[in-house]
């Protein structure tokens, strides 16, 4: 049977080792957070629209609806870029007509050996209407959709396809977003045919 003194003799080095490990971890965390690099780093794109914590439920709903809409367009990009149509998680952000139309249009493009590469920019998204009291809360959004850097290319050769020179590549789009049990979903996306 060990005495209290012999137990302390074994515990003290372990305690000191744990303290040294904790101190080293803290020092590493502090130095890694305070990098001296002047190069700004791009923030990662959110993989899912996370609910916003806010004291004002109206402002939180607006932020969540906009975040969902922006994530929706990132998934649309993925869907159009993947000829198999399997890499996108569009159902996390879209439903109803919006989901049906995007899936149908992407399939049509893929069936014709076309993919879209590049980026869609959702500019100045704003909530223009909000109804949180209905059975299914709903928001109406307006934004400037810029598809000028979203190129249609041959899926095999990656060569750009010629498109009409007078097509709108930056236009106003009106969208409806509903809050479902699993989160906000884009249910309708309607280009307004106006430049922005």
Feature-to-residue mapping (PLM):
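Charge-rich, low-complexity terminal tails
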Residues: 42-43, 62, 140-141
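C-terminal motif of bacterial Sec signal peptides marking the signal peptidase cleavage site
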Residues: 29-32
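Core segments of small alpha/beta cavity-forming domains
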Residues: 52-120
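Bacterial signal peptide processing site
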Residues: 34-37
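Bacterial N-terminal signal peptides that target proteins for export
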Residues: 3-21
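Structured, amphipathic secondary-structure segments that form assembly/contact surfaces
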Residues: 92-196
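Extracellular mucin-like PTS domains
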Residues: 42-54
């Amino acid at each position: 049977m060990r005495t209290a003194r012999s137990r302390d003799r074994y515990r003290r080095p372990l305690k000191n080792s744990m303290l040294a490990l904790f101190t080293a971890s803290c020092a590493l965390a502090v130095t890694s957070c305070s990098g001296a690099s002047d190069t700004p780093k791009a923030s990662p794109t959110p993989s899912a629209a996370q609910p916003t914590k806010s004291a004002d439920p109206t402002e939180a709903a607006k932020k969540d609806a906009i975040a969902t809409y922006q994530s929706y367009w990132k998934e649309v990009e993925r869907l159009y870029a993947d000829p198999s149509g399997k890499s996108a998680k569009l159902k996390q952000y879209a439903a109803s007509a919006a989901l049906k139309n995007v899936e149908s249009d992407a399939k049509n493009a893929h069936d014709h050996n076309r993919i879209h590469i590049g980026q869609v920019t959702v500019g100045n998204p704003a909530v223009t209407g909000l109804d949180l009291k209905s059975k299914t809360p709903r928001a109406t959004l307006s934004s400037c959709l810029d598809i000028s850097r979203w190129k249609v290319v041959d899926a095999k050769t990656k060569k750009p396809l010629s498109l009409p020179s007078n097509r709108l590549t930056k236009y106003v789009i009106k969208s409806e977003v509903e809050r479902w049990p699993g989160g906000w979903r884009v249910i309708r996306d309607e280009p307004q045919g106006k430049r922005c």
